[in-house]
Amino acid sequence: MFALIYICAIVIGKIKFSGTEKQQPSSLVSETDNLKDSESNFVEEETERSTQKTAEEQEIILEKETTSESLQTETAESQQTDLVNQIDYALEKMTVEQKVAQLFIITPDALTGISGVSAAGDATYAALQQYPVGGLVYFENNLQSYEQISEMLHNVQQYSIEISGLPLFLAVDEEGGTVARISGQGYGIEPIEDMAAVGASGDYERAQEIGTYIGSYLSDLGFNVDFAPCADVLTNPANTVVARRSFGSDAALVAEITDLQRKAMEQEGIIGALKHFPGHGATSEDSHQGFAYIQKTEEELMNNEWIPFKKGIEEGAKMIMVGHIVCSEITGTEDPSSLSYYMVREILRQKMGFQGLVVTD
C-alpha cells in the first residue's frame, strides 16, 4: 500500500510544471491503473482469506461445542446406566419382605412402636433391621429443637445405609402458612404466610423465594422430601380443608406457582410432592377424617383441577401424592383414589404420563 502511494506521488509530481498540471501520458496512466488493479486484487484476496479463516474458526468452535455436548450427553447416559445397574444389583440381593418394606414411608413411632420418637438410637436401629422401610415422615411430636432434629435425621440416615445400603426418604409436611412443622415453631425459622395470600398477590417471585427458603432449611436439617406444594385448585367455595393452603381458584396460576415452588425446592435438594391428586379443592369433606368426594367427570377435571398436575408432570415432577378422594363419576365405585387402580394406573400413569413416585396421603 505504501509503495503504491509513493509511486503515485512521484508520477503526479513529474507531470506538474509551473503550477499547471499536464495531461498524463497513456503509459503512466496504464501503469497507475495496473497498480490500482493489483492493490484491489490484493485486498480482495486478503478479505477472502480473512472470511475463510473466520468461517474455519467458527467451524472449529462449533465442532468443540458439539463435542462438549456429546461428551456431556454420554456422561449423563453413563451415569444413568450406572445408577440403573446399582438399583438392579440392590434389588437382586433383597428378599421379598425387604422389597415390600421399601414401599412404605411411615412415622418413626410406627416403625419402633414407641410414641413420640425424638431420637434415633438403639430402638430405631433394631426396628430398621427388621423393617427396612423406604422412608420416614415426621410430625410435631417428633420435633423439639433444630439440633435435635438434625441429629435424629443424621443418625437414622446412617443406620439405613449401614443396614440396607439404601438411603431413606426423610419427609415432612412443610407447606408454609397453616401447615408448617418447622417454620414458626420456635426453631429459629421465620414463619411463612398462607399460600392463599401468595396466590392472591400473583407474585411469582415470592412463590419461588418461599420454595428456596423452605428447601434450604429442610435440606440443612437433613430432610430430602417435602409433602408440598399444594397443587389443589380451589373450585369449591365451601371447601375449608385447603382454602388457606391452595394458591387459588385460577388453575393456570396455581399450575405456574406450584411448578416454580417445586423447582426451587429441588434446587435446594428437596423433592417436592404435588398434592392432593385428583384435587382436594373440589371437595367439601376432609379426607383425613373420612372419604372426600368429587362429583365431576374426567373431562371436567382434566380441564381444570388437573392442570397443575399436568404442568408438573410435563416439567419433571418426581413425586405426586394421591388423596383419599372418591371419584365415583369416573371410576363407578366408592374406592378412594389412593386405592383405585383406574385413577392411579389408567389416568395418572397412562393418560397423564407420570412416571415418578406415587405416594398416598
Write out the residue ranges for each language-model feature.
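Short glycine-enriched loops at secondary-structure junctions
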Residues: 109-112, 172-185, 224-234, 274-280
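Conserved beta-strand positions in the central sheet of alpha/beta enzyme cores
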Residues: 105, 137, 226-227, 273, ...
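Second-shell loop/turn segments in exported
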Residues: 77, 89, 110-115, 135-145, ...
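Second-shell residues forming the walls of enzyme active-site clefts
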Residues: 95, 115-116, 120, 145-164, ...
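N-terminal hydrophobic targeting/anchoring segments and the immediately downstream early-domain regions
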Residues: 2-33, 39-46, 59-170, 174-184
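Substrate-binding cleft of extracellular glycoside hydrolase catalytic domains
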Residues: 168-211
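A substrate-binding/cap region within the structured catalytic cores of diverse enzymes
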Residues: 193-223, 228-251, 258, 262, ...
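Short, acidic/polar
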Residues: 113-129, 207-214, 302-308
